[in-house]
C-alpha cells in the first residue's frame, strides 16, 4: 500500500508540473516560482497568479511559501486534500485538520481523523448555546523518524476569541469563527500499549487553532495553526490567485 501511495504521489506531482509547464506564460510563472522554492520556503514577494489552480499559503519559521493542490481523495468524512511543494513535501488536510505530512525532518505518515467532530455540528451547538460543552475526540497517528506507531491523543475543541493580529491575508476577519484544539488527559486510555506509546513520545504539542467560515451551505476552515513537534509549527491559509484573462 505504501509503495502504491508513493508511486501515485510521484505520478501526480509529475503530471502537475508537466501541465503547468505546457500551458500559458502565467502557468510558467507558477512553475518557476515552485521550482525556486526551498522546502516550505520561497520569497514572500513572489505569489501565485494563476486562478486555474488552488493554492495554500504556508508560513513555517516566519518564511512564506505556496503549495499547489494536486488532487483530492474522496472519503466519507470529507475529501482529503493533497498539497505539494516544489521539493515534493506533501501536506494532507481533511476538514482543516492535518491528515498527514511528509518531506520534513518530522513526518506524520498516517493520521486517523475518523472520530473528529464535524465543524457544522460544532457551529450548530454554538448557535444554540454560547458556552457549549467542549467536544472531545481521539486522534491516532504514526510519526517518523523512530517509527512511533499508534500515538493516541485525546483532543478538546473549544471556541476562542479572535487573535489580536492573526497572520491572515485578504480575508474578512469579521466572518471568521475561531476554535482551539488541544490535548487533554484521558483517564480511559490506560492500556499498557497506550502507556508505552505515549511515554515514548514524551511530548504534548501546542494547541491548534482553526478559523472557520461559512461559504454558502459549506463550512470551511480557511486558516489554521498546527504543530507536528514542539519546535515545528506552521500556519496555513487557503489562497485565491487573482482572476486573470486568458485567450
List PLM regions with ranges.
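Surface-exposed, glycine/proline- and aromatic-rich loop segments on solvent-exposed faces
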Residues: 108-118
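Surface-exposed helix/loop patches within compact recognition domains
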Residues: 117-141
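C-terminal motif of bacterial Sec signal peptides marking the signal peptidase cleavage site
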Residues: 19-22
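Bacterial N-terminal signal peptides that target proteins for export
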Residues: 2-12
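Acidic, serine/threonine-rich low-complexity disordered tracts
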Residues: 24-85, 89-102, 106-110, 135-247
Amino acid at each position: 500500500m505504501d509503495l502504491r501511495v508513493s508511486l501515485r504521489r510521484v505520478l501526480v506531482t509529475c503530471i502537475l508540473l508537466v501541465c503547468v509547464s505546457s500551458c500559458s506564460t502565467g502557468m510558467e510563472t507558477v512553475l518557476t516560482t515552485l521550482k525556486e522554492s526551498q522546502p516550505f520556503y520561497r520569497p514572500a514577494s513572489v505569489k501565485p497568479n494563476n486562478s486555474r489552480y488552488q493554492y495554500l499559503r504556508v508560513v513555517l519559521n516566519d518564511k512564506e511559501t505556496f503549495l499547489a493542490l494536486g488532487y483530492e481523495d474522496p472519503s466519507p468524512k470529507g475529501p482529503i486534500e493533497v498539497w505539494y511543494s516544489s521539493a515534493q513535501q506533501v501536506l494532507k488536510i481533511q476538514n482543516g485538520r492535518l491528515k498527514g505530512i511528509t518531506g520534513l525532518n518530522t513526518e506524520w505518515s498516517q493520521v486517523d481523523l475518523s472520530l473528529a467532530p464535524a465543524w457544522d455540528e460544532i457551529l450548530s451547538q454554538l448557535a444554540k448555546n454560547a458556552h457549549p460543552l467542549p467536544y472531545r475526540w481521539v486522534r491516532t497517528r504514526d510519526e517518523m523518524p523512530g517509527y512511533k506507531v499508534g500515538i493516541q491523543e485525546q483532543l478538546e475543541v473549544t471556541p476562542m476569541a479572535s487573535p489580536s493580529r492573526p497572520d491572515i491575508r485578504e480575508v474578512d476577519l469579521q466572518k471568521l469563527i475561531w476554535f482551539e484544539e488541544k490535548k487533554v488527559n484521558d483517564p480511559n486510555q490506560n492500556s499498557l500499549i497506550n502507556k508505552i506509546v505515549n511515554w515514548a513520545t514524551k511530548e504534548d504539542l501546542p494547541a491548534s487553532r482553526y478559523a472557520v467560515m461559512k461559504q454558502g451551505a459549506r463550512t470551511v476552515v480557511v486558516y489554521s495553526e498546527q504543530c507536528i513537534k514542539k519546535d515545528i509549527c506552521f500556519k496555513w491559509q487557503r489562497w485565491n490567485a487573482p482572476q486573470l484573462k486568458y485567450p
